[in-house]
């Protein structure tokens, strides 16, 4: 048990628990169950307070990745884990400043929002019994009690659970994980049975009268009385026969538990149909940039000025012509739209002073491309509720699409290194509290691995485009504004560079609700010939607009330059999330951190330096038909980042559903690999739930194909 505790808990928690036990003359090596219980209780107290702050207005907020400039105060003061003298000093100080009554016993936390002390309980027994014991011991209505159990139950004073559901779910999941880990090492039974009640119980708590009647009425089905139910709960064996538990739940439930063996799972069925097409809001691996180094022109930093300067670096423009039409569109309109952009940029240059923004003339081609006057007229419901055959218009089922090879190629490209740096070191942001040495060291190592990654370029491009589009949508609602697609980076030598990918023209944008749509036309430069993979470009009309001279090993070669044009749309909420794409950096950093933590707890010292600097070691990156792919720690960082970025770029209901449902199957397979002998019922229903999300989304189809590779290798 002692080894388990040292592996399972953060070294800081283990150290605090050892200190606390020594303070009471107890030995962690002998009283190992108590050691585990104290660590668990400490961790729950810390998780309870994590991410909860009070802002300048005194409102309670949850912040998982802090804005370094926000003036935030921690919502909870942690008293548990301090030595007794310090803990009482903190309690006395709180009582003096807030006027709250001083508690008889040391509580665990103080809540600055609700102005009350909190006693946290973690029990291996029945929450109600433990709650009553705590209440009896404290005998104070001022201290709020919150009990968690290892089975996911909780109980709190007046059913006031203080925290939001997600924060509490995090605690319950962690407790459930600890229990599973103990069970897999055959430690759980002894730990469960070792819990003693609160020593200060004086009388048995009897329920009488009306409360007793209510208790009898509110029992689950099949229980005649409270005694009967209590006896069942006391004798409830969590790892007993699941069928028995189900039969006690309800007469309706009829589930037969099937053993889940290596031969049980089948691969997911991916849809047949035409190959899937690109649906990201901007080009990824196929994008081409017109760039200026060390920009110092007049108006540098104003997007329109930067764009014109970038356009002037290219001399190979030619009369545009359509090389790949859009099947359903009026293609000449796309051609005329590009010619209009060129003409209006020329007009700007002829003006004495270049304006900061450019609104396009409302030509027929732009009105068509932006869907002007195409939306059906809205009628007030009161005016038509008497119409007999009023119904929602029929919409077609989405056509199933099959996985195309371009999706994996896009992902591989996103993991690669470019020759420019896309984020400065402080992009991930400092913590509100002074960040300790280890955390900043990890951040710097991680940033060094991903700053040149193509996925990081996509983040900065996405942030820029979404910010510019949302600004324009609010500032120029009726105008067809021309928005350059720009990014900034640094070259290997540290020189600043401004890049132009193309342009967006925004349609009318009276966005009242979060989901109201603004249409836009995107026009993006590329060297990719669309005729090589026409299925990828189904939604695009592609023009040839120039010839570019490229330096190669054999000298200069001329390549045609293409313009990928399409009509697209987005909403306020999508743009808001697009502006927050930097969060992907944080998410992947946290995933890497948990790998370092696992390694550190085994070695019992911080392994950050060794983790990043041992270049010879390889790590698992993912599954492919060839087996488990491995790579350097840098490759792991970039792959995790690319996954996070693609989840953002290709966010969809299909992805939400697939992630949630496939995770269940993944956990069952993991349990089988850990020899936990999992059992399932209605596995067919789970497969159905997963496969109904596999329709036409390229990123979901690729993830499903990876999942099948994982199944094959995991069950060998």
UniProtKB/Swiss-Prot annotation:
Its EC number is 3.1.-.-. Its cofactor is Mn(2+). Keywords: Cap snatching, Endonuclease, Eukaryotic host gene expression shutoff by virus, Eukaryotic host transcription shutoff by virus, Host cytoplasm, Host gene expression shutoff by virus, Host nucleus, Host-virus interaction, Hydrolase, Inhibition of host RNA polymerase II by virus, Manganese, Metal-binding, Nuclease, Phosphoprotein. The active site is at 134. One of its GO terms (biological process) is symbiont-mediated suppression of host mRNA transcription via inhibition of RNA polymerase II activity. A motif (Nuclear localization signal 1 (NLS1)) lies at residues 124-139. The keyword Nuclease applies. Mn(2+) 2 binds at residues 80, 108. Influenza RNA polymerase is composed of three subunits: PB1, PB2 and PA. Interacts (via C-terminus) with PB1 (via N-terminus). This is Polymerase acidic protein. It comes from Influenza A virus (strain swl A/California/04/2009 H1N1). The gene is PA.
């Amino acid at each position: 048990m002692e080894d388990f505790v040292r592996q399972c808990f953060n070294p800081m928690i283990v150290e605090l628990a050892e200190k606390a036990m020594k303070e009471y003359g107890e030995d962690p090596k002998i009283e190992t169950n108590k050691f585990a219980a104290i660590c668990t209780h400490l961790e729950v107290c810390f998780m309870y307070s994590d991410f909860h702050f009070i802002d300048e207005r005194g409102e309670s907020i949850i912040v998982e990745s802090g804005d370094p400039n926000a003036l935030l105060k921690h919502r909870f003061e942690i008293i548990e884990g301090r030595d007794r003298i310090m803990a009482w000093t903190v309690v006395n100080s709180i009582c003096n400043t807030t006027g709250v009554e001083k508690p008889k016993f040391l509580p665990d936390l103080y809540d600055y929002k609700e102005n009350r002390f909190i006693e946290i309980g973690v029990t291996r027994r029945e929450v109600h019994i433990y709650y009553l014991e705590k209440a009896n011991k404290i005998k104070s209505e001022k201290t709020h009690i919150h009990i968690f159990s290892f089975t996911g139950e909780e109980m709190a004073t007046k059913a006031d659970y203080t925290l939001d559901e997600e924060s509490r779910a995090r605690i319950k999941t962690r407790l459930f994980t600890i229990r599973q880990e103990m069970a897999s090492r055959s430690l759980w039974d002894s730990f469960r049975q070792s819990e003693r009640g609160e020593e200060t119980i004086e009388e048995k708590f009897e329920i009488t009268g009306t409360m007793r009647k209510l208790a009898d009425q509110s029992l689950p089905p099949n229980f005649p009385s409270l005694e009967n139910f209590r006896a069942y709960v006391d004798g409830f064996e969590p790892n007993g026969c699941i069928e028995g538990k189900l039969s006690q739940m309800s007469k309706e439930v009829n589930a037969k538990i099937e053993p889940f063996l290596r031969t049980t799972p089948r691969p997911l069925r991916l849809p047949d149909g035409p190959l899937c097409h690109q649906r990201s809001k901007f080009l990824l691996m196929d994008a081409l940039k017109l760039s200026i180094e060390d920009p110092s022109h007049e108006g540098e930093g104003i997007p329109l000025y930067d764009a014109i300067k970038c356009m002037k670096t290219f001399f190979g423009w030619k009369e545009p012509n359509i090389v790949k039409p859009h099947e359903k569109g009026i293609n000449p309109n796309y051609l005329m739209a590009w010619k209009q952009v060129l003409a209006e940029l020329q007009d700007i240059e002829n003006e004495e002073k270049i304006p900061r923004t450019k609104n396009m003339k409302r030509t027929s081609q732009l009105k068509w491309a932006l869907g002007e006057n195409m939306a059906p007229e809205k009628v007030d419901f009161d005016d038509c509720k008497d119409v007999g055959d009023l119904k929602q218009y029929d919409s077609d089922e989405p056509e199933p699409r099959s996985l195309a090879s371009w999706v994996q190629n896009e992902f591989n490209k996103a993991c690669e290194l470019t020759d420019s740096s896309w984020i400065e070191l402080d992009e991930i942001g400092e913590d509100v509290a002074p960040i300790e040495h280890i955390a900043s060291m990890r951040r710097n190592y991680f940033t060094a691995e991903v700053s040149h990654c193509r996925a990081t370029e996509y983040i900065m491009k996405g942030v820029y485009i979404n910010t510019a589009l949302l600004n324009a949508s609010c500032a120029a609602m009726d105008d067809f504004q021309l928005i350059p697609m720009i990014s900034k980076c640094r070259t290997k030598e540290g020189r600043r560079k401004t890049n132009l990918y193309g342009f967006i023209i925004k349609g009318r944008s009276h966005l009242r609700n979060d989901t109201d749509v603004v249409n836009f036309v995107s026009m993006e430069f590329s060297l990719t010939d669309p005729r090589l993979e026409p299925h990828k470009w189904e939604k695009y009309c592609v023009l040839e607009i120039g010839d570019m001279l490229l330096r190669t090993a054999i000298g200069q070669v001329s390549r045609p330059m293409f313009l990928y044009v399409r009509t697209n749309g987005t909403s306020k909420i999508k743009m808001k999330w697009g502006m927050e794409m930097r969060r992907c950096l944080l998410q992947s950093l946290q995933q890497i951190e948990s790998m370092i933590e696992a390694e550190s707890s085994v070695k019992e010292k911080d392994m950050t330096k060794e983790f990043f600097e041992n270049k010879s070691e390889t790590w698992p990156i993912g599954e492919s038909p060839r087996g488990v792919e491995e790579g350097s720690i840098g490759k792991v960082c970039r792959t995790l980042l690319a996954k996070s970025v693609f989840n953002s770029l290709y966010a969809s209901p299909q992805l939400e559903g697939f992630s949630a449902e496939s995770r269940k199957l993944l956990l069952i397979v993991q349990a089988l690999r850990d020899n936990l002998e999992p059992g399932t019922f209605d596995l067919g229903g789970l497969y159905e739930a997963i496969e109904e999300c596999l329709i036409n989304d390229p990123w979901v189809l690729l993830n499903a194909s990876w999942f099948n590779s994982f199944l094959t290798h995991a069950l060998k």
